[in-house]
Amino acid sequence: MAENNNLKLASTMEGRVEQLAEQRQVIEAGGGERRVEKQHSQGKQTARERLNNLLDPHSFDEVGAFRKHRTTLFGMDKAVVPADGVVTGRGTILGRPVHAASQDFTVMGGSAGETQSTKVVETMEQALLTGTPFLFFYDSGGARIQEGIDSLSGYGKMFFANVKLSGVVPQIAIIAGPCAGGASYSPALTDFIIMTKKAHMFITGPQVIKSVTGEDVTADELGGAEAHMAISGNIHFVAEDDDAAELIAKKLLSFLPQNNTEEASFVNPNNDVSPNTELRDIVPIDGKKGYDVRDVIAKIVDWGDYLEVKAGYATNLVTAFARVNGRSVGIVANQPSVMSGCLDINASDKAAEFVNFCDSFNIPLVQLVDVPGFLPGVQQEYGGIIRHGAKMLYAYSEATVPKITVVLRKAYGGSYLAMCNRDLGADAVYAWPSAEIAVMGAEGAANVIFRKEIKAADDPDAMRAEKIEEYQNAFNTPYVAAARGQVDDVIDPADTRRKIASALEMYATKRQTRPAKKHGNFPC
């Protein structure tokens, strides 16, 4: 049925209800059967299917279904654009109220015009007003060229709204199709981006790049999910398809509060904090041997269940949401199996972003430390490791949520500070007996301090080994730091979960104020 702008109204209520049903059928059909079939043939759900699958059954309440564009140029006066290419409204996820929007690629390629952007922004404003999370499925060819500057203005309003919501309600972007040009800045301004393997996101596409720079690149290589996860770090989760993306969004939301005035999520506690002796066997005493820190995480969180964030990016650092005794926490952990757990530019950015989010939404932070230092190298220095490393220092210093730090093994120099030691505001600091808390490793320190003795010795190698052991025993232990109050307790690894749970309970009522200011100057 074609859209009818001059509908002759029926003379009875029953007739008008029938007309309403017909009008709604046109709107819900989107771009029509042929375009819906094409969407399905590409392994993609339609805009309404995505919302219905994401939200609790029968909970979606659409708003603005009858909204229309007001453009008359370039044949737009005759164009049928149901819901102006975006479905907006409210519903619930696992019983929790949310606001959501979903671009409809079957309607003019999901292109964003004035009315579409207005609908999205109004939905975001309602999320802000009610203190509810906002979720948005992006699937659009970009700006609606027929509307000219009005479409550009619409993007600007969306960006402004993204920033207004930032730190107040969680924003989750799901890239489920093309997201090109200026449109890609909106998801970049949200808290989390979930991207399906069939989606693409870039400022300029392969054809433009080819014409300007001569570079040959495919859409997947340039802006596919794997590229954005492993190389650019623009996204937080990769999903196989729409179904998987919706499941990730639900799990992610389960760890988050509704807004910044609520405490961290607390559900389904696992009260078992009995010693887990398996933790004693994961971390080798020999600092040159690697291990997977995720094995440690699995032993200290409820049910061994956690949601890793940016799992494929800066893999020398692990960031994840989990629960300890039912309480939602954010975990930041060095990964010794990759680059020995060194902090580099990408890991610093990854950690700082995660810490900022957790602090914004009252989620306690747990640090698992095994870090030998910042990654040395000319490219790291030229790339701005000083500035990027400072982001971690800034984020942890600014954070006022409970901060619990556990030193598993190495904790050397400035990299230890960047992982939130006592001086950067850690509320509780624990160390395993394997911890080496020092300004630098024993080998490097011995080479500096005892350089003359080693050089003058009859057997320099034997003297070096002796001095390394001497320094190791004197300084690279947890007990010197404990004696100076830098560590609260040296603990049996088996007791780690109990110690963290106890500290989280103690600091659940933590309140900390800082000097009044408009905002700090975050090192960008």
UniProtKB/Swiss-Prot annotation:
GO terms for cellular component: acetyl-CoA carboxylase complex. One of its GO terms (molecular function) is propionyl-CoA carboxylase activity. It is an enzyme of class 2 (transferase). Residues 13-268 form the CoA carboxyltransferase N-terminal domain. Keywords: Transferase. Gene3D superfamilies: 2-enoyl-CoA Hydratase, Chain A, domain 1. One of its GO terms (biological process) is fatty acid biosynthetic process. The keyword Nucleotide-binding does not apply. It comes from the Bacteria. Coiled coil: none annotated. It catalyses: (S)-methylmalonyl-CoA + pyruvate = propanoyl-CoA + oxaloacetate. Residues 13-506 are annotated as: Carboxyltransferase. Its EC number is 2.1.3.1. Residues 274-506 form the CoA carboxyltransferase C-terminal domain. The 12S subunit specifically catalyzes the transfer of the carboxyl group of methylmalonyl CoA to the biotin of the 1.3S subunit forming propanoyl-CoA and carboxylated 1.3S-biotin. Homohexamer. Transcarboxylase is composed of three subunits: 1.3S, 5S, and 12S. The core of the enzyme is composed of six 12S subunits. On each side of the core there are three pairs of 5S subunits. Each 5S dimer is attached to the core by two 1.3S subunits. Thus the total number of chains is 30 (6 + 12 + 12). This is Methylmalonyl-CoA carboxyltransferase 12S subunit. The lineage of its organism: Bacteria, Bacillati, Actinomycetota, Actinomycetes, Propionibacteriales.
